[in-house]
């Protein structure tokens, strides 16, 4: 059961306190990264005030790991009292004093890299992906990182796309993997986190959106002009994974060469994509004889999804 003091601090952290009273918050320990600690009213999320995540919501578990890596004892105690999970604390504690504090608060000893990685990635949520990133990133305790230990999970999720993340730096592989999983499972908070943290990986985000059929993220990238790729290269990437009807259609509307797309689908033996591309070619050549399910020139991702959610390839199409 939470103490009265802990409950009081939590209640205050959920209030909007005028700046002239911030010194009181600092005195009470409701202070982190040179800003007041703010909690979401309805969930266990910290509202960050520091850049690059200004205004972002961060789960208490993730915030706790950040505080542990900073050796911020008061904030570690505070977040743990509020319900943050100290389980992975020893993995990130950088000093003996922080390690001892984490043990006192219930941190788990002797966790290895694979246990942490597979344990968190078993459930694909924004919180777990960001938490996994915070545990492994810039962590001298994990300098002997061997990505091959996580290879089975990475390969299972990325399949052929794994060849795009091969790198001599293990951490780079994991960052691209986490980013890809965020896009694949349409985890908006995780996508936002990685986009703000790794702006130089915007092309990777675009590639993931195309390959994993996330037309919503693809549309956002295109509309905001975040990064540019040749449309035929986009179409080729979309055709590499079967049933990528949403992103294939989007690339088609943007002007992708449908004949080249048909060739790519044949080359990769993606039969369902091939039938779909044939239907799109019919739509382009003669809208009156095309399948009535398909409409031309739609770029709204919601409308594209609605249009294609019941689409079934017509195997009777001539090849």
UniProtKB/Swiss-Prot annotation:
Protein name as catalogued: Protein MGF 360-8L
Tree of life domain: Viruses
Induction comment: Expressed in the early phase of the viral replicative cycle.
Function: Plays a role in virus cell tropism, and may be required for efficient virus replication in macrophages.
Protein species of origin: African swine fever virus (isolate Warthog/Namibia/Wart80/1980) (ASFV)
Keyword annotations from UniProtKB, A to Z: Early protein
Xref: Pfam families: ASFV_360
Family: Belongs to the asfivirus MGF 360 family.
GO BP terms, alphabetized: taxis
């Amino acid at each position: 059961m939470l103490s009265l003091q802990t409950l009081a601090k939590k209640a205050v952290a959920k209030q909007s306190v005028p700046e002239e009273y911030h010194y009181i918050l600092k005195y009470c320990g409701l202070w982190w990264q040179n800003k007041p600690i703010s909690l979401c009213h309805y969930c266990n999320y910290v509202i960050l005030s520091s850049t690059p995540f200004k205004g972002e919501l961060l789960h208490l578990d993730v915030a706790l790991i950040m505080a542990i890596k900073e050796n911020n004892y008061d904030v570690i105690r505070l977040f743990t009292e509020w319900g943050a999970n100290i389980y992975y604390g020893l993995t990130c504690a950088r000093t003996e004093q922080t390690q001892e504090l984490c043990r006192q608060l219930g941190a788990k000893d002797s966790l290895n890299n694979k246990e942490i990685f597979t344990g968190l990635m078993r459930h694909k949520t924004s919180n777990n992906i960001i938490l996994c990133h915070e545990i492994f990133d810039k962590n001298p305790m994990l300098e002997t990182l061997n990505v091959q230990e996580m290879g089975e999970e990475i390969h299972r999720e990325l399949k052929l796309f794994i060849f795009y993340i091969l790198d001599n730096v293990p951490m780079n592989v994991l960052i691209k993997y986490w980013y890809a999983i965020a896009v694949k499972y349409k985890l908006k908070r995780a996508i936002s986190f990685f986009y703000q943290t790794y702006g130089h990986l915007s092309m990777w985000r675009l590639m993931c959106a195309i390959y994993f059929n996330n037309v919503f993220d693809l549309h956002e990238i295109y509309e905001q002009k975040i990064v540019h790729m040749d449309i035929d290269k986009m179409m080729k990437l979309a055709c590499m994974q079967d049933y990528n009807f949403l992103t294939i259609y989007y690339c088609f509307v943007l002007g992708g060469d449908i004949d080249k797309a048909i060739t790519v689908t044949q080359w990769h033996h993606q039969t369902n994509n091939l039938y779909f591309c044939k239907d799109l070619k019919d739509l382009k050549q003669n809208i009156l004889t095309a399948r009535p399910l398909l409409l031309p020139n739609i770029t709204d991702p919601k409308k594209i999804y609605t249009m294609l959610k019941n689409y079934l390839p017509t195997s009777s199409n001539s090849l």
